Regions:
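Conserved N-terminal beta-strand and adjoining loop/helix that marks the start
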Residues: 1-23, 40
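A generic fold-level signal
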Residues: 7-9, 18, 28, 76-79, ...
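Conserved Nudix-box catalytic region and its N-terminal flanking loop in Nudix hydrolases
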Residues: 18, 22-57
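Unchanged
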Residues: 41-64, 75-125, 147
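Short, solvent-exposed loop/turn elements at beta->coil junctions and helix N-caps
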Residues: 68-74
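Charged phosphate-binding loop/patch that engages nucleotide di/tri-phosphates or the phosphate backbone
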Residues: 123-147
Length: 147
């Protein structure tokens, strides 16, 4: 394949879980959806550098990655997301241009406030499997089972 359709983007997201077992989610300003903080990697940064940058930009928090918990491909947009379970290591929640709001949610609340394709990222981060989940979705719904 040639042209723009042949290219993929890589994104990263951090599922920040606090000492009470709650997950930080942000409400995106661009679409109003709740999801884990994250975004597209820049070409010249490592995966971990991008993760730390994106979480800090969208929340004000400094985090420590604990584990890669999932790899997700948006089949419609060609975006591959690497999602990490993280713990807070500093900083403070800060208003910014990307997040309209913040919430600390329980694992059980994820499906109620976000599309399946994004809720599953939260749920997968709570699993204690040695292997990360590998899933495909259409931007809203899963289209393949977990591995």
């Amino acid at each position: 394949m040639t042209g723009e359709a042949a290219h993929h983007s890589v994104s990263v997201a951090g599922v920040v879980i606090d000492e009470n077992g709650r997950t930080l989610v942000i409400q995106r300003r661009d679409n109003g959806h709740w999801e884990a903080p994250g975004g597209i990697l820049e070409r010249d940064e490592s995966i971990i550098e991008g993760l730390l940058r994106e979480v800090r930009e969208e929340t004000g928090l400094i985090v420590e990655p604990v584990a890669l918990t999932g790899v997700y491909k948006n089949m419609r947009l060609g975006v591959v997301a690497l999602v990490f379970r993280c713990r807070e290591a500093g900083g403070a929640l800060t208003e910014n241009s990307e997040a309209a709001g913040f919430r600390w949610i329980l694992e059980s609340e994820a499906r109620a406030i976000m599309p399946e394709a994004f809720a599953v990222r939260i749920l997968d981060a709570y699993r204690n499997d040695a292997e990360p989940a590998i899933r495909d979705h259409d931007g809203t719904k899963l289209i393949t089972p977990t591995r």
